[in-house]
Amino acid sequence: MAIRKIGIASRCDRPEVLQMVRDIIAHFYSKVQIYVSTATADVLDIEGTPVERMRDKGVELIISVGGDGTVLRNIAKMKDPLPVLGINMGTLGFLVDVEPEDAIETIEEVLYGFSYLERMRVDVFLNGEMLETATNEVAVMSAKPAKIIQFEVYVNDCLLDEMRADGVVFATPTGSTAYAMSAGGPIINPRVNAIVVVPVAPFKLSARPWVIPSDSEITVKLSDHKKEAVIAIDGQKSYRIRPDDVVKLKKSKYPARFVRISDTCFYERVQRKLS
């Protein structure tokens, strides 16, 4: 086989997910060397390897068993993400293409070689210090539920807009079908190098989504010096920001990588997922 080492990382709170991991290990342990993430391994009572160390072990791809959130968590652990193959054990999943009944057969095919798609990510900085890298989106929201915040958004030091809203979402093309879409933003083909800026429940009719070049530097500043806000990154981690803080977003030099398993066009795939 072309692939000799694979990683497996999964949700750990659902029996059917853990059983799928067991089935994959049982089927492939004699064919390839398998590294199981520490969290999953602890539940299965086997030896584990942190996802962030799998590249050092020579792992060539990671099989993520769960939903989109599982994929995002695994990617976030890697500075330079390995290719990911998602097994869909959730509900609606844009980042997980393989259904459970097709998992073993699909992995068999992938082990003989695969291609992958690169998707841009966004580095998030707070007062000059890097926090995380987002694959889907960065949301700046009020720290208090049902309270609006006032903030300014700059693109390359040019004022894009000053908004009063529940918040604002900055999404990659990959994330344009997630929170940004629910907030009224456009769906962006991943081949388009862009970042979507989507106000969330803005308090003025002229506030509209923007699509800006991916090489732009985006700056967010709170205008109301009495209110704090929260940055949520891919719905996984959050950080509180204060009125004097400066948030900056830049395109990351390390893309996410997703194993390509079909030639279905992007538009047909989105229609199928949303139908």
UniProtKB/Swiss-Prot annotation:
Catalytic site positions: D68 (proton acceptor)
One record GO biological process: NAD metabolic process
EC code: 2.7.1.23
TM ranges: none
GO molecular function annotations of the record: ATP binding; metal ion binding; NAD+ kinase activity
SUPFAM superfamilies for the chain: NAD kinase/diacylglycerol kinase-like (SSF111331)
Compartments where located: Cytoplasm
Principal EC category: transferase
InterPro entries: ATP-NAD_kinase_N, ATP-NAD_kinase_PpnK-typ_C, NAD/diacylglycerol_kinase_sf, NADK
Cofactor(s) this protein cannot do without: a divalent metal cation
GO cellular component: cytoplasm
Keywords assigned by UniProt, alphabetized: ATP-binding, Cytoplasm, Kinase, NAD, NADP, Nucleotide-binding, Transferase
Primary subcellular site in the record, as a coarse category: cytoplasm
Catalytic activity: NAD(+) + ATP = ADP + NADP(+) + H(+)
Binding locations of NAD(+): 68-69, 73, 136-137, 147, 164, 166, 177-182, 201, 236
Pfam families: NAD_kinase, NAD_kinase_C
Protein family according to the UniProt entry: Belongs to the NAD kinase family.
Role: Involved in the regulation of the intracellular balance of NAD and NADP, and is a key enzyme in the biosynthesis of NADP. Catalyzes specifically the phosphorylation on 2'-hydroxyl of the adenosine moiety of NAD to yield NADP.
PANTHER family according to UniProt: BIFUNCTIONAL NADP PHOSPHATASE_NAD KINASE, NAD KINASE
Name assigned to this protein: NAD kinase
Species of provenance: Methanosarcina acetivorans (strain ATCC 35395 / DSM 2834 / JCM 12185 / C2A)
Gene from which the chain derives: nadK
